[in-house]
Amino acid sequence: MCGRSSLTKTEKELEQRFRATFYSEDLERYNPLPNYNVAPTHMHPVITQDEPRIIHLYRWGLIPYWAKDIKIGYKLINARIEGIDEKPSFRQAFHKRRCIVPFDGYYEWQKTPEGKIPFRIQLKHVDIFTIAG
């Protein structure tokens, strides 16, 4: 998955899709939807393994337990499945802190002489898809 994504659905659409409700304090504090430009460090809806009927807002990016600086979370937004359970950055989260992260699109970039052009990619028959977090 790329570094930029989108989630243009309303809170109600997400609640219906996942049969869950937003954690009320998260919505009072911040109302992020819809968003055509989800980027690392942005607040984004997440459904955790521990609370599958509550949608929380968490900052996008992974901060390993051993990190001395939270800025490492800006860079840890992608993981390859091969070896994820062995890499120190992802191992503990992979085994103990699983979640799903909803999106409705992501961007791939084409380089041109004038600069980069974003292309938004969506699934043809699915309004909302999730990635593993």
Residue ranges and their predicted role:
Residues 1-133:
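Short linear sequence motif anchored by a di-proline
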